[in-house]
Regions:
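N-terminal, positively charged/glycine-rich alpha-helical extensions of SAM-dependent methyltransferases
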Residues: 1-28
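Conserved SAM-binding loop and adjacent beta-strand
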Residues: 30-46
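Class I SAM-dependent methyltransferase SAM/SAH-binding core
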Residues: 59-111
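A short SAM/SAH-binding and catalytic strip from SAM-dependent methyltransferases
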Residues: 119-133
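A short glycine-rich, Lys/Arg-flanked "PGG" loop and its adjoining helix->strand segment in the class I
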Residues: 135-146
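Conserved beta-strand signature within the Rossmann-like core of class I S-adenosyl-L-methionine
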Residues: 147-156
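Short "lid" loop at the C-terminus of a central beta-strand within the Rossmann-like core
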Residues: 155-160, 185-187
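Class I S-adenosyl-L-methionine
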Residues: 176-212
């Protein structure tokens, strides 16, 4: 069996392929990817959320194994965090860390089985190649309270190509979001160059805004 890796993840095409890759990767994701590649993006998102005054309850989109929630806890957030992911294998790993109030198995591009209850929406690594596009903004906004703070990482490789810039501009124009600002960050640390030089220099926008 081919070992799941970043290249395979960024080339995903369709829900079946996504479920298979993350089912196979879940057990080793934290070590073979997050640690070895110095995957700093979850910490960047958590830091931006906290610095902007983010509070809970928080919905962590694409929660994975809980890396972003762990960073939020490490930075002092004690409010409830709920985690949502398409992969049950990844959610099982997250559950074992006892970081979340509840975990939800759902497709973020569809209407979510949740009420409008969140003061914060976070996401790290979900809005990238082969994953989720701006079509997820509407379902996420539907569960955010007025004034809720969003802190979402969006890989720069897909920012314009996949229409994230246009989608956010449209949401601003429709007065559905406000106070949009971008923070540029490196996705990985220096160790990534020896493991995956093709992606070691990847950059992302931490996209901060509030629901109207």
């Amino acid at each position: 069996m081919t070992q799941p890796d970043l290249t395979a993840a960024l080339a995903l095409n369709g829900p079946d392929a996504t479920l298979k890759l993350y089912r196979d990767w879940a057990a080793t994701y934290d070590t073979t990817f997050a640690t070895d590649m110095q995957y700093n993006l979850p910490a960047h998102v958590a830091r931006a959320f906290r610095a902007a005054g983010g509070i809970g309850p928080v919905l962590d989109i694409g929660a994975g194994t809980g890396l972003l929630a762990q960073s939020l806890r490490d930075m002092g957030l004690t409010d409830p965090i709920d985690g949502l992911d398409f992969s049950t294998g990844m959610l099982e790993r997250a559950a074992a860390k006892y970081l979340y109030r509840t975990l939800i198995h759902a497709d973020v591009t569809q209407t979510l089985p949740l009420s409008r209850q969140y003061n914060g929406i976070t996401s790290s690594g979900t809005f990238t190649s082969g994953h989720v596009g701006p079509e997820a903004f509407a379902p996420i906004l539907a569960v955010a309270l007025p004034g809720a703070l969003f802190a979402l990482s969006i890989n720069q490789r897909v920012w314009t190509e996949n229409g994230f810039d246009a989608a956010l501009a449209s949401l601003q124009h429709e007065n559905r979001i406000h106070d949009l600002r971008l923070i540029e960050v490196a996705v990985y640390g220096t160790a990534a160059a020896a493991i995956d030089p093709g992606h070691a220099d990847d950059r992302a926008w931490i996209t901060l805004f509030r629901a109207t």
